[in-house]
């Protein structure tokens, strides 16, 4: 097996070979590079973390995993002046970059299969791109998982592989969203074991069997262990006991779906002197009025300031927000990986030309779908892809008469169907997405707004979830960065009805916008929505969609508080 690149023909290659022959120099070089690269992944690019760190605030970030939040909270209480979050993120980035660089240099200097080197580069590129597409995922978590996967490809001992597994799980605990990433990690390592066995053409796995079995045990136990840790964090941490507790903090509650909105809210909070918390743990706003009544803060909505008390509210548990957690179906994938790996270990593996393409397509499936799929109905075609890949990968399985080309073609067909079908339908119309009457009528509104490409400020009330509304808006080319789910805001301030009557506005769902603006603009006299949008958000809003139980009204703003009806049903 040749190295991916002719290293000795250039200065850079000679330098890498020199480092690979002297471990001490290699470690010094990697540590220096890791230190230099850390600012590129610092919290300066993350407005929420930067705000929490540099403002001296040590209250828990609600977007983080409860277990990690509990650790940060406990350490912060012990050392109030220590920037715990910054130090922890810096440490994670330092170790992750070190592991990534070491993996790449090992691939360049050693005679490793080119497919493993390509896999390493693809892993790094994917997590970098995914962090760009999904900025709510903290970069340190993505780096930790990518480095664990890449370093596993060059690990030769079970201790190193155990460390990679634990390091990956540590990255998962940084964010609550990362729990489901355990599933594709299992697939990644299963594919790597297949590559190693194909490369060495062994009848049995020998030294691979123990480390592989150990990894599977840890991975299978990871989901319930993380769930137990989450419950422990809820029970032990005063910040997560029965809901939300802002200890000596003043919180500006907002529902911006992305960090661009949060960045704007940070500017608002800086002007009002409020701390900002991303309110993404509530299913919807139906519990917010109850929370306000319990805290007796109806007239001071923008400054919920409760010292020593707990605000009772209903939180989304991980198994409710992420169907993969707490569900038995995802556990099938590690089990299937174990069975298929066992077959390959026991039987003689016959290397074929189609093995590498199968592995490549399997990686594409894992990357594109396993980490992003929340709908359980998609598990069936994904499982079929796994089976087809396994058939074409191992010619000694019972179904060896099926040509590898057919398996690859069917897998590509399934992938194309899942990728191109934005409605979530499965091939052949097995699963058909249905809309309620209200959602279908809202679709008419979206079609109308698509023909009028103004920047829209929309309330999605007819949709069951915000993600559903966001998907519809993207399909209709609306500005999703200016979409805010304001359902329930009109319940905050009953006294605002006087201003509605004075402006001859009868639609309560139009009132919620002005209430929403007045709520954020604490201390500002005028409730006008237009100056606020232009000044704070930079949005020159031309239309407002008010959707209530299937009925809609589209208003055009003429002046600060004058609205003209454009269209209604």
Task: Give the positions of each predicted feature.
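Hydrophobic, aromatic-rich transmembrane alpha-helices
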Residues: 14-17, 96-102, 313-350
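Extracytoplasmic catalytic/substrate-binding loops of multi-pass membrane glycan-assembly enzymes
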Residues: 34-52, 59-72, 80-83, 434-437
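Signature aromatic-anchored transmembrane alpha helix within multi-pass, membrane-resident enzymes
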Residues: 113-114, 161, 206-221, 396-425
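Hydrophobic/aromatic-rich transmembrane helices and adjacent perimembrane loops
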Residues: 139-142, 180, 365, 371-394
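Membrane-interface transmembrane helices that cradle and orient dolichyl/undecaprenyl
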Residues: 145-160
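Membrane-interface alpha helices of multi-pass inner-membrane proteins
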Residues: 161-178, 182, 187, 216-225
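Juxtamembrane membrane-water interface segments immediately following transmembrane helices
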Residues: 180, 211-284, 458-466
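Short periplasmic/luminal acceptor-recognition loop of GT-C membrane glycosyltransferases, typified by
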Residues: 446-526
